[in-house]
Each structure stands twice: as structure tokens, then as C-alpha cells.
């Protein structure tokens, strides 16, 4: 049995879980998330815990068992505490401004880039070189962070660009300025 899949998912107080066939909806203080899970995998609620069960030991069911448990656990965590990604902007003149629709990014191009945040994701900038992305869905928060980072990935010579907080950019030596 999957080691991850067989662990029960604790449901904290203030979170309600509705299971309708293969659809699971989780409501909590940070919002509401719903997802249609694979039809073979069964999610059941017993008291303040959710259990994920698989019908057989087929390879496909084993793979889906742990995945489904992790997806549901992320939904529960998202509606209780939420998820957060922090991006750092490095470079002369590189900055981010928060607008009502999302973010206005100056990343060294001849124009500024407008990034529209999807619904359920909040973008804030505590200072012009830091962007904080928060939301209930781990997928959406990670996708928005990846899209903003892809606008100007950190380059290896000077390290300019957008990177995740704590990301290490491998630096390269420039041209050897010898004779």
C-alpha cells in the first residue's frame, strides 16, 4: 500500500468537506476549492479525518492513490492556511508595482509588462524588488509564480532577473579579459 496514500488527512475545525461521487469540495476560512478526482479512487470521511482508498494493487491504482491523497491534503491546507510564494527581482531599474488588476513589471525591456492575476490569487509587493503571491490553491499560486519568473529568468552572468526566494543562481565567469 502507498505510504503516502494510507495516511489519514486531518480536517481542522472550521473546514467542511463535501464528497459527491468523485468530486470533492473543501470550504474553509481562506475560500473554497473543488476538484474531480479519478473515478477509481474512493475518498471517505470518518469523523475529523479523510481516508483515501484504492480498489486494487494495480500499478495505475498505486500511482493514483498517493497523488489523490496529496491533492486532497493540499486542498485542506489551502483553505485553512493558504499557500505563498515569494519572488525576488534583481537588476538595475527592475521593479514591480501592484495595480488593481495584478502587477506592472519593469524588467529591463523597452516596455513595462502588465500581469493580470487570476481569480483567487493575490499579488502584493512589500517593496519594489519583492513580489508575494498568495492564494488557497497550491497549483494556481505556483503557476502564477512560474509565469512571472518566466518573463525574465535570472541570467548566469550578473544574476539579473526574477527568481524564487532562496533560489541559487549558478554564476558563470565572463570573458577572460586578458591579452
Swiss-Prot record:
GO terms for molecular function: rRNA binding; structural constituent of ribosome. It comes from the Bacteria. The lineage of its organism: Bacteria, Pseudomonadati, Gemmatimonadota, Gemmatimonadia, Gemmatimonadales. The keyword rRNA processing does not apply. This protein binds to the 23S rRNA, and is important in its secondary structure. It is located near the subunit interface in the base of the L7/L12 stalk, and near the tRNA binding site of the peptidyltransferase center. NCBIfam families: L6_bact. One of its GO terms (cellular component) is cytosolic large ribosomal subunit. HAMAP family: Ribosomal_uL6_B (MF_01365_B). It comes from Gemmatimonas aurantiaca (strain DSM 14586 / JCM 11422 / NBRC 100505 / T-27). Part of the 50S ribosomal subunit. This is Large ribosomal subunit protein uL6. Gene3D superfamilies: Ribosomal protein L6, alpha-beta domain (3.90.930.12). Pfam families: Ribosomal_L6. The keyword rRNA-binding applies. GO terms for biological process: cytoplasmic translation. Disulfide bonds: none annotated. Keywords: Ribonucleoprotein, Ribosomal protein, RNA-binding, rRNA-binding. Belongs to the universal ribosomal protein uL6 family.
Amino acid at each position: 500500500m502507498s505510504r503516502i496514500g494510507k495516511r489519514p488527512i486531518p480536517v481542522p475545525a472550521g473546514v467542511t468537506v463535501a464528497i459527491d461521487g468523485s468530486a470533492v469540495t473543501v470550504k474553509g476560512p481562506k475560500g473554497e476549492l473543488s476538484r474531480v478526482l479519478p473515478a477509481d479512487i474512493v475518498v471517505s470521511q470518518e469523523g475529523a479525518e479523510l481516508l483515501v482508498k484504492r480498489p486494487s494493487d494495480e500499478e495505475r491504482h498505486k500511482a493514483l492513490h498517493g497523488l489523490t491523497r496529496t491533492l486532497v491534503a493540499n486542498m485542506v491546507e489551502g483553505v485553512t492556511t493558504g499557500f505563498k510564494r515569494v519572488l525576488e527581482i534583481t537588476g538595475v531599474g527592475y521593479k514591480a508595482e501592484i495595480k488593481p488588476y495584478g502587477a506592472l513589471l519593469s524588467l529591463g525591456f523597452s516596455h513595462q509588462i502588465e500581469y493580470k492575476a487570476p481569480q483567487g490569487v493575490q499579488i502584493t509587493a512589500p517593496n519594489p524588488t519583492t513580489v508575494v503571491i498568495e492564494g488557497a490553491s497550491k497549483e494556481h499560486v505556483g503557476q502564477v509564480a512560474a509565469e512571472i519568473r518566466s518573463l525574465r529568468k535570472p541570467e548566469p552572468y550578473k544574476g539579473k532577473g526574477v527568481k524564487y526566494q532562496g533560489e541559487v543562481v549558478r554564476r558563470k565567469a565572463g570573458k577572460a579579459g586578458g591579452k
